[in-house]
Swiss-Prot record:
Protein task: DNA repair enzyme involved in the repair of deaminated bases. Selectively cleaves double-stranded DNA at the second phosphodiester bond 3' to a deoxyinosine leaving behind the intact lesion on the nicked DNA.
Gene Ontology CC, one term: cytoplasm
Source organism (scientific name): Rhodospirillum centenum (strain ATCC 51521 / SW)
Protein's name according to its UniProt entry: Endonuclease V
Site (Interaction with target DNA): 86
Gene3D superfamilies the record matches: archaeoglobus fulgidus dsm 4304 superfamily
A Gene Ontology biological process term: DNA repair
HAMAP family in the cross-refs: Endonuclease_5
Enzyme class (EC, first level): hydrolase
């Protein structure tokens, strides 16, 4: 798919102060409603890295599925060197450059993207799902496995579909969602061009057998496989 032109400091800011300002600015561009059109294809995205890799290589995968059948239609992969070290709250600047390259390897644009990470449930309102969604101007959902900020507003039931709000500074920033009976919950938030109710609905609709929805589960597997293949010299994808 064709990628938009992106302002340089939206991806590689010179320092964390600039990065924080960029996050606040881009958070103001998040559209918290939608999607506006039919969703026929969905993409899951995730990244993988070698443990203690001083080079900072990020291996990204985007897996495109048919929304109705969950058939895998395409897989895009790319490796990039992260422009900044890992700093909590600034994950997008490490991972989004590689993910954009992986999106560029696809032949078509997804109708909806599920991201392994936070959307607007972030100190400055721009987790990786919101960062990616705004840059691509594509409906995006953050499906995180842990809390970055906030606390559940109530006790979560043990059955699939149980949910409570995740609240921070007096406002709801995500939904704590039980995606499978008696497993740890997910933290689902708007990324861009989708409302919270639709984000939860799609997360459940695309899940079932596992804790993770199928798109991000497949992307997790694809990113790990790409990293392992790179280590053996057998990887195919977009390099540096």
């Amino acid at each position: 798919m064709d990628l938009p032109e992106i302002q340089a400091d939206w991806l590689t800011p010179p320092d964390l102060a600039t990065a924080a300002r960029v996050q606040r600015d881009l958070a103001g561009r998040v559209v918290p409603h939608g999607p506006d059109g039919p969703v026929r294809t969905v993409a899951g995205v995730d990244v993988s890295q070698f443990g203690r890799d001083p080079s900072g290589r990020v291996f990204a995968a985007v897996v495109l599925l048919d929304a109705a059948t969950r058939e895998v239609l395409e897989v895009g992969t790319a490796m990039r060197v992260a422009p900044i070290p890992y700093v909590p709250g600034f994950l997008g600047f490490r991972e989004v450059p590689a993910l954009l390259a992986a999106f560029g390897a696809l032949s078509r644009r997804p109708d909806l993207v599920l991201v392994d990470g936070h959307g607007t449930s972030h100190p400055r309102g721009l987790g990786i799902a919101a960062h990616l969604g705004v840059l691509l101007d594509i409906p995006a959902i953050g499906v995180a496995k842990s809390i970055l900020v906030g606390a559940p507003a109530g006790e979560l039931g043990g059955t699939r579909g149980s949910r409570v709000p995740l609240v921070w500074q007096g406002r709801t920033i995500a939904t704590v969602l039980r995606s499978k009976d008696r497993v740890a919950p997910l933290y689902v938030s708007t990324g861009h061009r989708i409302d919270e109710e639709a984000a939860v609905d799609w997360t459940l609709r695309l899940g079932g057998r596992y804790r993770l929805p199928e798109p991000t589960r497949r992307a997790h597997e694809a990113a790990n496989a790409f990293r392992r293949a790179w280590g053996t010299g057998a990887a195919e994808g977009s390099g540096v």
